[in-house]
Amino acid sequence: MNRNRHIRRGYHPEAGERQIIDSLFAATHSDPFAYLGRHRVNDEREAVRVLRPDAHHIDIIDRHTGAVIMPSEKIDERGLFAAVLPEHAPDYALLVTYHEGEAAVREEDDYRFGSALQHTDAWLLGEGTHLRPYETLGAHFAEMDGVSGVRFAVWAPNARRVSVIGEFNGWDSRRHAMRPHTGNGLWDIFIPGVGLNALYKFSVLDANGNIREKADPYAFGAELRPTTASVVRGLPAKAEAPAFRRRANSVEAPISIYEVHLGSWRRNPENNYWLTYTQLADELVNYVKDMGFTHIELLPLSEYPFDGSWGYQATGLYAPTSRFGSPDELKALIDAAHAAGISVILDWVAGHFPTDDHGLNTFDGTALYEHADPREGYHQDWNTLIYNFGRNEVKNFLQGNALYWIERFGFDGIRVDAVASMIYRNYSRKDGEWIPNRYGGSENLEAIAFLRQTNAVLKSETPGAGSFAEESTSFADVTREAGLNFDFKWNMGWMNDTLRYMQEDPVHRKYHHGKMTFGMMYQYSENFVLPLSHDEVVHGKRSLLGKMPGDCWQQFANLRAYYGFMYGFPGKKLLFMGNEFAQGREWNYQEGLDWHLLDEAGGWHKGVQDYVRDLNHIYTAHAPLYQLDQQPEGFEWLVADDSDNSVFVFERRDRAGNRIIVISNFTPVVREHYRFGVNAPGRYTEILNSDRTQYQGSGIANGADITAENVPSHGKAQSLSLTLPPLATVYLYQKAAPATEIQTALRADKQPAVKDKQAKAK
């Protein structure tokens, strides 16, 4: 037996170690794992080196028995300890004395653990095909070698050194420098003992030698402004998709969306502070259910530093904002909506990100997530940076985020913001301010491919989840697989045209008649949503009510008539919060809506609210208003050219042959004996009239039932004669009759000349 085997041998730094040690304390060493921890030294013995700048003494102990294997030597007064281990020394831990005379603390050596990164993950990230990179990158609770802690991983290919800094190490970048993975730009480290809600950042020694303290791009939690640290949180459990998701997002389903900014929908009256997710799960969900909306669309909920961005400039894309509560409470809000039969859409910002120092901006000293050239990478209108959609790791980051919100929180779809700014290189740029694509065109080919692929991934991985595009140009095939592959596109053209028409004085509307009909010229080119969104009630544009001309009565009547026209027109519906009760002032994100208006004398606002509630319930209960939105068989103009009277009449149909005739009179003149042709004989029932007194209208109506007469009109053998209320929209419903009833009606009216196609359809 070698009697000298367990005799302590002093650690003698080699000549070249001084430079290494200095770089460790300067936090400039690119790979501390190559030096710290357990390593063989020149005489083929093993040594343990530990960097603890605040420690007084460290013993190397048997991690199983706690027995001291070897006391260490302090080989640098700044706090570097080393011990040469005896042969066949067991696995070790540390017994650290921080102050002389105090009790020692058992700790793990962070540099004794291997990497948790898998080669497959790194390969998929580099290829741009890692569907769920958030399961690998970021901060994740883990157990390694029986020790609990958190594994951290980040992508920073051009960094010289990356460290995890946080509460657990005094924000000291020397303590937890990460392991570099040459070739893929990844860095990782496992830190034992880090707990839930610990604050952290990445300290990045960038490509230019500058220190940048960055929030974790993949963090599941983040501090509320003004502080900017990431928060260690567990990966949310997968959410169960509601059984009705696929049906609710179908192009043949009734979709009526209530767009909500959670911070200003309603506030606590005592302190004007935000409602919590828990309060909203009760108050918002019950309100939306009562009002008859089918979907809630939430403005962006990724953590953002500037309240005035409304969430559209996020720095923590994977971190639900803590303004309103915890991630679990957000999931409970979505669950409450699902329990009420309501789908929830998340406003998702994938086009740009803010320039905040702690965010993605020049993350490792280079344009990592953005383009280096400002002609490609800088958005002049919003002072934000544009994602580099041609970079695989960036595509992974964004596509994974879309999946994350749907799979982990239960959102039923995403609405992608500012798509036009993504797909055009010259968006809001003058000549000379943009770079053409490889073919010389203005399209951003990489962004187009990214959107198409992201939507394909959603369709494959989250069946039934919807994707909605806010796209403001005439870019073709937004909702076609060969195009951008969205499910729906916001019809910004319809919104702009019809609002311009409605802002005209009724006496002038006859000169702008085509603005209300033009939408049908391209209706079947895309699957459309008709949006009256937050963008239309801010920045001096006035509220929807404020846009309406005339005195008080006329303003409210105009708005009710317009809503009726909108709900009858083909396309899914969207109203921003406050529009449903005609809020008079513009939206202010710093205050709750003016709910007190519902209690005002006169009942104007309450009348609009009651009207929208009835509109929603009528819309969802009658298939002619939604089933064939995207098929020509579901729509027919009956009167499209009566510009002198500013009257529009059209028919909506479903597959069963049920009909709803929509009549809108956009003048304050009562039109008596107004006649128009109809396709089917028989009785029609008035199911909606925006001029009813319960809505604060004038009460002009036609009775419950109206019968078609044997009077030709507008090229039809049958016609109706009505009194049209002023500034009003009326819906007439006719249920499809059995063929025998149709034949009887035809004989009674002596009208055999009904088209064979119609007769067969019935």
Swiss-Prot record:
The active site is at 417 (nucleophile), 470 (proton donor). It comes from the Bacteria. GO terms for cellular component: cytosol. It catalyses: Transfers a segment of a (1->4)-alpha-D-glucan chain to a primary hydroxy group in a similar glucan chain. GO terms for molecular function: 1,4-alpha-glucan branching enzyme activity; cation binding; hydrolase activity, hydrolyzing O-glycosyl compounds. It holds the Pfam family Alpha-amylase. Keywords: Carbohydrate metabolism, Glycogen biosynthesis, Glycogen metabolism, Glycosyltransferase, Transferase. It is an enzyme of class 2 (transferase). Disulfide bonds: none annotated. Its EC number is 2.4.1.18. One of its GO terms (biological process) is glycogen biosynthetic process. CDD domains: AmyAc_Glg_BE, E_set_GBE_prok_N. The keyword Phosphoprotein does not apply. Catalyzes the formation of the alpha-1,6-glucosidic linkages in glycogen by scission of a 1,4-alpha-linked oligosaccharide from growing alpha-1,4-glucan chains and the subsequent attachment of the oligosaccharide to the alpha-1,6 position. PANTHER family: 1,4-ALPHA-GLUCAN-BRANCHING ENZYME. Belongs to the glycosyl hydrolase 13 family. GlgB subfamily. Monomer. This is 1,4-alpha-glucan branching enzyme GlgB. It comes from Bergeriella denitrificans. The lineage of its organism: Bacteria, Pseudomonadati, Pseudomonadota, Betaproteobacteria, Neisseriales. The gene is glgB.
